[in-house]
Amino acid sequence: FNIPLHSAEFEINFINVFDESSISEVIQELKYENNIKDIKIFLDKKKWIERYEIKRNFFKPSSINIFSRKPIFIWNNNSFVDKEFVIFQKSENSTFDSILSINCPRSLLDDIFYFVQNPIETSENSLVSIDYNSVEGWVFQYEQFQAKLGKNLDNYKFENLSKTMEYLYAKRKNPSIVDLRSNAGVALKYDK
């Protein structure tokens, strides 16, 4: 959105901001603020703000342009992560349709970040969520099937998953589970 709002002596423009509660918080905080230094300190503390521009005008109201970070996935249902691996809080009211959801411990987030930037998808199967649990390891949920990759992620598993997806698409096969946890090969499970 691009929402011009006026506070004290400033017009505030929110550009590509997707979270209305974040907008409200900024408006409430800056409503009566005139001090540029205090405004900068406040805006610098907000991790969801990628950058901002403050333009001083002498004959009309000054303006603040606030640009939001664009999340590439939701982490553990309470945080967003952007393309620069900046983690910022997700408010309860945030609505972000069709964004990847990842649930894993912080210590494993680095492992999955590379894959998220270069996902393996086909036109018929896009990635919906990635979960890690101590029993099965990494589980990738696609629109039409689930891929179990095990506890250790490496290029071999991603290549194997990519080739398996290409094969399944070419042969018009629709398994419910693609299991890549074994070094012996790929196991497919079809629902009856």
Model segments located where?
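Charged, solvent-exposed interaction patches on well-folded alpha/beta domains
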Residues: 1-192
